[in-house]
């Protein structure tokens, strides 16, 4: 399993066991078997450890291309391409089924994580809205 996936699985398990505020990044690093410093080479913060990175460079580039009428010039085709890029980024990890199941379990057990998840989704929806309006 790639280290970034190990980090997510460990972070999600810690949320399920202790709640979002119930563990430290030091504990997460220990569970993954890396130093705290090494942990931060892979993730930005606790939220990204638990929920994954919010917006990759690839996805942001796709939003910019979409807003500019690229790559095909067809709204329908470009919408499909943008949606598939976002979807593939979210589920492209071969460990997606396990991570998805753990995420659902963590969201069901922790209200703070649910709030962070909703805020993140609102930001992504806003970014999609901006790209559509720019087009």
Regions found by a protein language model. Name each.
Residues 37:
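Key DNA-contact positions within bacterial/archaeal DNA-binding proteins
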Residues 43, 102-109:
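Short helix-capping/turn signature of helix-turn-helix
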Residues 62-96, 100:
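Hydrophobic alpha-helical connector segments
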């Amino acid at each position: 399993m790639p280290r970034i996936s190990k980090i997510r699985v460990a972070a999600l398990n810690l949320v399920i066991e202790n709640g979002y505020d119930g563990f430290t990044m030091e504990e997460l690093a220990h569970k993954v078997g890396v130093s705290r410093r090494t942990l931060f080479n892979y993730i930005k913060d606790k939220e990204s450890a638990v929920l994954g990175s919010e917006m990759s460079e690839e996805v942001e580039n796709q939003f910019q291309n979409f807003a500019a009428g690229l790559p095909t010039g067809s709204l329908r085709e470009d919408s499909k391409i943008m949606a598939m890029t976002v979807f593939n980024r979210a589920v492209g990890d071969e460990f997606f089924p396990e991570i998805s199941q753990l995420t659902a379990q963590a969201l069901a057990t922790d209200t703070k994580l649910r709030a962070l998840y909703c805020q993140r989704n609102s930001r992504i929806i806003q970014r999609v809205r901006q790209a559509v309006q720019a087009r």
